[in-house]
UniProtKB/Swiss-Prot annotation:
Main location class: cytoplasm
Protein name according to UniProt: Translation initiation factor IF-1
Purpose: One of the essential components for the initiation of protein synthesis. Stabilizes the binding of IF-2 and IF-3 on the 30S subunit to which N-formylmethionyl-tRNA(fMet) subsequently binds. Helps modulate mRNA selection, yielding the 30S pre-initiation complex (PIC). Upon addition of the 50S ribosomal subunit IF-1, IF-2 and IF-3 are released leaving the mature 70S translation initiation complex.
InterPro entries with a match to the protein in the record: NA-bd_OB-fold, RNA-binding_domain_S1_IF1, S1_domain, TIF_IF1
One Pfam assignment: eIF-1a
Residue ranges of every copy of the S1-like domain listed in the record: 1-72
The entry's keywords: Cytoplasm, Initiation factor, Protein biosynthesis, RNA-binding, rRNA-binding
Encoding gene, per UniProt annotation: infA
Keyword Lyase: no
């Protein structure tokens, strides 16, 4: 999958799920399940409920995504 195919959206973390998965509410009101990207996992970046994040979603499955960035 090429990077150009991904959709980037901002959202807020609603809850933390097992295995570093998170439920994120996007700015358009949709709720997706997202996991942490590899660089965030490698650098031990902590994500808590209420954090603003940038989520990368594929157009093929709009219910799953990858957390790419955590805002301060």
């Amino acid at each position: 999958m090429a990077k150009e195919d991904c959709i980037e959206m901002e959202g807020v973390v609603l809850e933390a799920l097992p295995n570093t998965m998170f439920r994120v509410e996007l700015e358009n009101g949709r709720i997706v399940t997202a996991h942490i990207s590899g660089k965030m996992r490698k650098n031990y970046i902590r994500i808590l409920t209420g954090d603003k994040v940038v989520v990368e979603i594929t157009p093929y499955d709009l219910t799953k995504g990858r957390i790419k960035f955590r805002s301060k």
